[in-house]
Every structure is written in C-alpha cells, then in structure tokens.
C-alpha cells in the first residue's frame, strides 16, 4: 500500500512508513468482523507507536492552534467498534481533520486497539489529526479503571509504563481559529490567560489540584454561580456566569469539552456558550446514551453527527442533526 504524500517522511518521521501503513491496515481490517474482535499488534510495534507519537506531541504546543474545518470527538473509553463507526461516518483520515478530547482508554473492552489506531493516525497525519489528554490518560486513574489490566493481560506491565510516558506528553487544550477553546474537562479558577496553558510543563503527571488538574477534571454546574464543589472529589464545578465571563474576556465564541455522559451525545450549557460532546454510545453497556461528533465548518458553524444507541444487540444507526 503506498503511503499518502508526506506520510513517509514527515508523517512517518521516526517510523517506517510501510510498517505504519500495515499497522493501520490491520487495525482497520476488523471493520467487517464482529464487534469486539481483537487486533494483536506486536509489543515492539506498540512501543514504536508510543515513542514516535510522544516526540510529535512534544514538538507541538500544549495549547494547539488549529483551523476549521475539523471534526471534534469526545470520550471513546475503549469502545473500539464505535470509534470505527465514527470514522466511517465522518470519513477516515485524511478525508477529514480530527480533534479528540481525551479519555481513549479504560472501561471499554478494547483500549489497546483504540489508542493504537489513534496514535498511528497521529504519526501518519501529524498536521491533520490531533489528540488531547483526558483525565484517564493518567497512570493513577487507568491503573484502576481497566487499561492497566488490559495491558497486563495482553502484554505486560512494562508496556503500560510506556503508554504512561506517552500520555504524560499529550497536549491539554486546543484553540480553533482563535474562537473555539477545547479541552477535556473545563475551566479553572487558575486560568487567567491562555498563555498559562502553553507554559504548563511536559512530560508531567496530572496533579491533584491546579490548572492542569482543572482542565482535565472540572465540570459545568447547572445550579452553580461562580465556582462550586465537584462531586467527583476532584477540581471544581463552574457556573454559566464563569463561562460568559471567560468567553468575553478572551474574545471566544464557544467552549467545547467532553468528560460527562450526555444522553444525546452532545449537550449545550450557558445559553450555547459551552458544549459537552461524548462519543461512546451505550456507554459501558450501562447507559442508553447516543454518541456524537461535532463538525466545525470553515465559517465556524457547528453541526452534530449522532451515533444512536444500539437497539439491544442490534447495529446502530446514524442520523445527522443540526
């Protein structure tokens, strides 16, 4: 399979382009198989995905500055067959530009396939495919919620540690055309200027408090004014007043975040000044939520593509919703 222009040199920097294409081919082969079919890459292939993508993350800013058109996806949580459906619907890279808002691993059954495909696309299309850090891209969290166990069962703990080194270098926010600010969690009382995001150190673990913690953990709160307690026991909740204040101060139009299951896959807050996007339908098999992806066109108009929750045991359908 011939590599796309630029994939060999630029995209495959530090990784053999033929090998990279073969890894992507194997990961996509299961599209036609039963959902849940595993793809067994070798340990050495996965290590390469981690180390090469890590260098790319570090070479790009911690606050990514991106341009529309772009498609934005929320939490995936190891639901690999749903990730493949998102791409089938939005177009497989490089057909569309993508920004993912974090939480690739844990809870679902196929965290390894999920993160490997995302890292492979990052290496192949470094200027068109972007990944932010979620609160689950952190050793103390994914040690508990499934990723560690999956790595240990299918490979070994050493490989989990290689992923940790990679996750510690993920960028934490993105700004689209200077108007849409994206992160996994939300706002922080410690965020007064966007440059503060740029100067957060990497590699780094996620601390228990402070700006980085809040960007990955905070939530909007319907009955909150200002800053409130967060039921998660980490970070804060913030009211609609804080959203309006922040947008006005920084001349922004919208905050786009993930981090919470929402029934329709997307949900507005603060008079459409903030949107939550969640891309794992039937989350954990326990919710009947839809998944969504937000498309931002050149004029910054946002529309939503919905992955409906499956009929029990059935395939699920897609519908386009404004």
From Swiss-Prot:
Residues the entry annotates as binding Mn(2+) 2: 103, 135, 184, 259
Gene Ontology MF: a single term: metal ion binding
Catalytic reaction list: O-phospho-L-seryl-[protein] + H2O = L-seryl-[protein] + phosphate; O-phospho-L-threonyl-[protein] + H2O = L-threonyl-[protein] + phosphate
Keywords assigned: Hydrolase, Manganese, Metal-binding, Protein phosphatase
Positions contributing to Mn(2+) 1 binding: 75, 77, 103
Protein's UniProt name: Serine/threonine-protein phosphatase PP1
Disulfide bond residue pairs: none
Family: Belongs to the PPP phosphatase family. PP-1 subfamily.
Names of the cofactor(s): Mn(2+)
Cofactor note: Binds 2 manganese ions per subunit.
Pfam families: Metallophos, STPPase_N
GO cellular component: cytoplasm; nucleus
Keyword Manganese found: yes
Active site: 136
EC number: 3.1.3.16
